[in-house]
């Protein structure tokens, strides 16, 4: 195997398609960005704790407000465009258009994506995915980095703002009028 990205193993230096993702051995996960395949390392316990708590908070908010959006935790397939060379599994995806959902996952950009940074995914989350999500039409992108004690919120609508928070802050969700997540109460 060769290495790609931030030491994330690639199978080989060639162009892949979504069909190649489906031929991976059971239990092996990968993402496909512009035809390059990135094997995904298993998440840490802390990563999973953050993901589980966030999904629970988001799901509860949607249900209590009788919202039309749906929240999904990885592994959940997101096909960002019509081409067959980009396939991602964001840590958390919130999709508000039911027409984008089918049995295979989400076709098109989710409204809100959260990536929880791990040592192997830093370059992907901070650079490559940031650009892919922005240009695919994601409205809001959060990067949760427990190592740096920060949450970066990119709002890709309107003024395209970027806000930086700590893991002790209240963070406003841009796709909802009255939704704020209290990271300080999550006991991460």
Give the label of every model feature segment.
Residues 1-188:
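Gly/Pro/Ser/Thr-rich low-complexity, intrinsically disordered segments predominantly at protein N-termini
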